[in-house]
């Protein structure tokens, strides 16, 4: 057994007792928020007469985390924007924002609109910081073959970095820093609200009703998140991780943070709870099979999961047996929570876990045989499912409404191309962030190491190549996102949101494993309310 020393939980049972200081004001905040929602709705309807105002208002509501209150109004406005030519096509800010919002909402618009902003030598002609930001963000909803958007990213990034050398207005400087760190399309929506509320509060043209509603909306959501954290922490404590599973990553709060990053709206509370539990259980499986167990023990656990029956626990060593039985019990309890009309969905939780375990077994076999996949594609075919991202995304669908049908789950079980793009993005990001740690722990060959061995490169060179492949996978995802299907758009939107969480968690390091790197942001999301004044 090769047990890697993971740091202990940073939160323990903190959320069992914690209540945000805003809790006593919940009733008043709810009443005030309802009044403001209608006031903002009137503002949104009034903006329909002018495309630029409509675009500005939509992007503001999205960034402040308010757009889910106005889904129908925003969809109607964007249909009008899509069909109308009544806008200034010489204004790069407007053209970029229009392009970004339409693509984000699934409308197919051509990137050729940006060629008119280049001179005879093919260089972009723009030096206004606001326009640069808009173009940079628009370029990241690119697909394959859109050379003009690839060039726009290179150009605008260089210009934005240079702009920080000159004095900028505080709100604009904050925007540039935020954008260079992560383009708008890839940011977690709930964290974007936390970051953008203070920026919006500095803007001269801010709408005070929208600003107040954004603060109330976040504080009310935070109360719901804390209730969920109490529930999942108490559930997690029953496993007695510190004593029985001391070798695993004890990360229940981080699991919930991850799920909230992908499904932040209040109506998805059950979805977050189920997905958080599944993420925690998948983490235990991963650490058992990848890091701690012997090959024989790992294969016994895999066999027990294939069988999915209590009697199979007799196959297992003591430290696996209790976990296995708790896994079965948890899936059964999820069925009870879902009720008779939706309990069938737990079948798909089981099937997704079996796929995960099958892939992990293959990786163990590779490790034991010192086998290196011949290509990155071969590697991803097996290692994509084992990163767990798609299983977690599917577990979030289990707790969602009736728009997610049995046919939806059957389709997801075929691992459609959109699912593969999520798995590839997550695996490549994970490997880039985790390679050095896992190499030292004697684990299976990552995509980074696979590339190094096949091409004779350094680790840094291989990481750069893997980053290029990650960008290609984002382009794959965008193309598939824009392709109409018979399945609810919510599925594609949520899968993209899970890709965003992977980008956040693995941007600089493995933030899930080394969770002190995200502790401050977890506190901002779950512990610290936003001041109304």
Swiss-Prot record:
Induction: Induced in leaves by herbivory (e.g. S.littoralis).
Cofactor(s) the record lists: Mg(2+); Mn(2+)
Amino-acid positions noted as binding substrate in the UniProt annotation, renumbered to this chain: 286, 290, 427, 430
SUPFAM superfamilies: Terpenoid cyclases/Protein prenyltransferases (SSF48239), Terpenoid synthases (SSF48576)
Pathway: Secondary metabolite biosynthesis; terpenoid biosynthesis
Binding site for Mg(2+) 3: 430, 438
InterPro entries with a match to the protein in the record: Isoprenoid_synthase_dom_sf, Terpene_cyclase-like_1_C, Terpene_cyclase_plant_C1, Terpene_synth_N, Terpene_synth_N_sf, Terpene_synthase-like, Terpene_synthase_metal-bd, Terpenoid_cyclase/PrenylTrfase
Disulphide-bridged cysteine pairs: none
Comment, domains: The Asp-Asp-Xaa-Xaa-Asp/Glu (DDXXD/E) motif is important for the catalytic activity, presumably through binding to Mg(2+).
Role description: Sesquiterpene cyclase catalyzing mainly the production of beta-farnesene and alpha-bergamotene in equal amounts from farnesyl diphosphate. Also mediates the biosynthesis of minor sesquiterpene hydrocarbons including alpha-muurolene, beta-bisabolene, zingiberene, sesquiphellandrene, sesquisabinene A, germacrene D, delta-cadinene, alpha-copaene and (E)-beta-caryophyllene. Involved in indirect defense by producing volatile signals attracting natural enemies of herbivores.
Protein name: (E)-beta-farnesene synthase
Gene: TPS10
